[in-house]
């Protein structure tokens, strides 16, 4: 199931940023690799985005993937 939110900030140089979910839950980490997999060049601050919340197999942390702008 897709979640929706707003890009809080994204730094392409650092390769990551955060999405503020519309449901008021904790901010979601987003890595540049997820942006590239989605075929997007960048995320803009304040941009609306749909995403899936996935758990990283290595770190166990949650992040956004399958992004749709």
From Swiss-Prot:
GO molecular function terms listed in the Swiss-Prot or TrEMBL record: DNA binding
Chief place where the protein resides: cytoplasm
Keyword Calcium attributed: no
UniProt GO cellular component terms: cytosol
Keywords: Activator, Cytoplasm, DNA-binding, Plasmid, Transcription, Transcription regulation
Domain CSD, residue spans: 5-65
Subcellular location: Cytoplasm
Domain of life: Bacteria
InterPro entries named among the record's database cross-references: Cold_shock_CspA, Cold_shock_domain, CSD, CSD_CS, CSP_DNA-bd, NA-bd_OB-fold
Database matches in Pfam families: CSD (PF00313)
Keyword DNA-binding attached: yes
SMART domains membership: CSP
Name of the protein: Probable cold shock protein y4cH
Organism of provenance: Sinorhizobium fredii (strain NBRC 101917 / NGR234)
